[in-house]
Swiss-Prot record:
Catalytic subunit of DNA primase, an RNA polymerase that catalyzes the synthesis of short RNA molecules used as primers for DNA polymerase during DNA replication. The small subunit contains the primase catalytic core and has DNA synthesis activity on its own. Binding to the large subunit stabilizes and modulates the activity, increasing the rate of DNA synthesis while decreasing the length of the DNA fragments, and conferring RNA synthesis capability. The DNA polymerase activity may enable DNA primase to also catalyze primer extension after primer synthesis. May also play a role in DNA repair. GO terms for cellular component: DNA-directed RNA polymerase complex; primosome complex. Belongs to the eukaryotic-type primase small subunit family. GO terms for molecular function: DNA-directed RNA polymerase activity; metal ion binding. It comes from Aeropyrum pernix (strain ATCC 700893 / DSM 11879 / JCM 9820 / NBRC 100138 / K1). Its cofactor is Mg(2+); Mn(2+). Its EC number is 2.7.7.-. InterPro entries: DNA_primase_S, DNA_primase_ssu_euk/arc, DNA_primase_ssu_PriS. This is DNA primase small subunit PriS.
Length: 342
């Protein structure tokens, strides 16, 4: 239990969490990964760290209580070296990043509706990777406003920056020549075959999107812009092409929201208190206005100068977002036994 009378130091909460055997997942081939941490003291980043075992990693996190914790999608022969040449690159996982603030109408506030939209895009990406490339992948919530999809297969580990960029462009539809995918009728009235849900690649995705919208497959051109919006995935191309990118450690806390980095399934994503280890009822003094929003399953609105009673996990998130500060109460940090399986 962490007392919040007179204010709440987020580092104390994070330290309490990491001391309770949290559900942190071990990255594959841990000894070949570079680790990096952002600390609370001056927001300093510490990089080029290596661990030989999960015990070493957990001990470090319990001692330092990092604000953010990362590992490299790359494997290196010497991960603690300071230059790429010295590290000895052995291959990288294929990583995709979806940030919901890039979606129309979504901004800094962690609204459930925007998270739901981002999740649906991430699921679409996972399904397309498997259907079109034969690559299984794993979906994660980043603990703030985004989702990561990671694929770790033999051939994709060896891809260079340009190959990764082309795969990313496939999902963003950048450079798409639609006339080659869905040709229009010819001058003599010859009508090309309409797309089918069983077609490979983009034709199949457009056909399935059309059926979901109730659009006749022979008339997809009339609704093509909406259909392209339905199949496009708003990933950050720069993230995918970067072979030295860092991913968040699953089970760690995101210092921008105080929420878990969580592995997700494809059956649905319902933001709620299960994403936070913090429990209790606290007082929160608002310093900024917040329009009514649905956050982690609760409706929240704020007016500057007012004091609100609210659940600790909501208050911690709002404090880290800069909407005010916890002014009183007690926060209970859950032990590992209470976790929903990740």
């Amino acid at each position: 239990m962490v007392e919040a009378r007179g204010g709440l130091d987020p580092r104390r909460l994070f330290k309490a969490y990491y001391s309770l055997s949290p559900p942190v997942e071990e990255p594959r081939d841990i000894a070949y990964r570079e680790f990096a941490f952002q600390l609370f003291d001056g927001d300093v980043y510490v990089r080029h760290i290596g661990f030989d075992s999960m015990e070493e990693l957990l001990s470090y996190m319990a001692r330092e209580a990092p604000k953010n914790a990362y590992y490299s999608v790359a494997r290196y022969s010497l991960p603690t070296a300071r230059s790429m040449e010295e590290k000895g690159w052995l291959g990288s996982e294929l990583m995709f990043d979806i940030d919901v603030d890039s979606l129309e109408g979504c901004g800094e506030v962690l609204g459930d509706s925007c998270l739901s939209r981002g999740y649906k895009q991430a699921v679409r990406l996972v399904e397309a990777l498997y259907r079109d490339f034969g690559v299984p992948s794993t979906l994660y919530f980043t603990g703030n406003r985004g989702f990561h999809v990671l694929a770790d297969c033999g051939w994709c580990r060896r891809l260079g920056r340009e190959e990764r960029r082309e795969i990313a462009r496939y999902f963003t539809l950048e450079g798409l020549r639609l006339e080659l995918i869905i040709p229009r009728p010819g001058r003599r009235g010859v009508r090309p075959a309409p797309p089918s849900p069983d077609d490979p690649g983009l034709r199949g995705w457009i056909a399935r999107a059309a059926l979901e919208r109730g659009v006749d497959l022979s008339a997809v051109h009339e609704a093509i812009e909406d259909l392209l919006d339905d199949v496009r995935v708003a990933i950050d191309v720069k993230v995918t092409q970067d072979i030295s990118r860092l991913a968040r450690i699953v089970g760690s806390l995101n210092g921008k929201a105080g929420l878990l980095v969580a592995r997700l399934g494809l059956e649905g994503f319902h933001p709620g208190d299960w994403l936070s280890p913090f429990r209790g009822e606290v007082e929160f003094r608002a310093s900024a206005r917040l329009e009514e929003s649905r956050i982690l399953g609760r409706t929240v609105s704020l007016e500057p100068g007012r004091v609100y009673s609210m659940p600790a996990h909501i208050a911690v998130l709002l404090q880290l977002k800069g909407y005010g500060a916890v002014a009183g109460g007690e926060v209970v940090v859950r032990a590992a036994a209470g976790w929903r399986p990740l």
